[in-house]
Amino acid sequence: MTGAQIKEWLEMSAGQFNQIDPNSKEPQQLINSSYPSYNYDVIDGLTYKFDLTQPNKYDREGKLVNQDVSRVRDLAYQGQPIDLNQTFLVVTNNYLTTGNFPGVKDAAEKRLLNLENRQDIIDYIVSEKTINQSADGNWSFLPNIANADIRFASSDNARAHLANQDAISYVGPINTGRICGVPFDC
């Protein structure tokens, strides 16, 4: 894949998040509840930021809806800005390679290997014996939304993990009690 194709893939993934008005004093929902969460991807080995003040470039189906916008910023590989013509070897699943996902669908070369993701993960865990499960923090949001009241739903059990989080605080239970992509009211 080219750097440009990878950028479009990330533009599609950025649809997971709502557009945020940094000047609003009203609570704003971070997660776009109409976006299928299985279409959100993190691409490891790269670093990047999302500018949530911009609208989504693609709709939930991968249709281009805002051609002249970009949410992907500071896209880099090994600390250097990505050359959009640079080529990368990317390994992903057949859902992405055979679908209509922006960027991925335009890749010049696609090989379907007879491998199953689950078995590959099992084999890796068995061979490594110890797995570092911590996130490497390779992506983030631009700080231009830092003063907005941004909210998202999570399990009440997550409260126990907030002690070391300066940027996240508990604001209360969800009124509807519904989860898993169903609209909610904080």
Predicted ranges, named:
Residues 1-186:
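Catalytic centers of hydrolytic enzymes
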